[in-house]
């Protein structure tokens, strides 16, 4: 279906607005994936706070121009599905990585985080970022472990001091 100028401007405006609030972006080629599988992916994306859209490459180049995602310009070749992570930087990468594992025809092209291009081979860097809750839990576990270790060392020092006396 041909898009007129107003439709193109509306798409660019919508996706640009989403890109401004996004933490990261992932670009993939969804050629050969069934409609049912894509529907499942979109549903999982909505639940994970990921905005997904298939947009013409020329329009996507306009969207990313001057933004933190400008490094993705060269990946807009062929059928392109773009996903913006709105709540957590690794959400879209995790979603696409898991989907690609189950669907051989789905290919992740690249990702962008804080203006840095992350090639598809290194997508794990972004996908394995802990969520805010996971990071807090790890920090608390480390702090708790350090306090317990300090207590054990203090008790051992007291024991050694009493044995020496």
UniProtKB/Swiss-Prot annotation:
Key words of the record: Ribonucleoprotein, Ribosomal protein, RNA-binding, rRNA-binding
SUPFAM superfamilies xref list: Ribosomal protein L10-like
Highest taxon above the source species: Bacteria
Gene: rplJ
Family named by the database record: Belongs to the universal ribosomal protein uL10 family.
GO molecular function: large ribosomal subunit rRNA binding; structural constituent of ribosome
GO biological process terms on file: translation
PANTHER family found in the cross-reference section: 39S RIBOSOMAL PROTEIN L10, MITOCHONDRIAL
Quaternary data: Part of the ribosomal stalk of the 50S ribosomal subunit. The N-terminus interacts with L11 and the large rRNA to form the base of the stalk. The C-terminus forms an elongated spine to which L12 dimers bind in a sequential fashion forming a multimeric L10(L12)X complex.
A Pfam family reported for this protein in Swiss-Prot or TrEMBL: Ribosomal_L10
GO cellular component annotations of the record: large ribosomal subunit
InterPro entries: Ribosomal_uL10 (IPR001790), Ribosomal_uL10-like_sf (IPR043141), Ribosomal_uL10_bac (IPR022973), Ribosomal_uL10_bac_type (IPR047865), Ribosomal_uL10_CS_bac (IPR002363)
Disulfide bonds: none
Gene3D superfamilies: 3.30.70.1730, 6.10.250.2350
This protein's name: Large ribosomal subunit protein uL10
UniProt-listed PROSITE patterns: RIBOSOMAL_L10 (PS01109)
Function: Forms part of the ribosomal stalk, playing a central role in the interaction of the ribosome with GTP-bound translation factors.
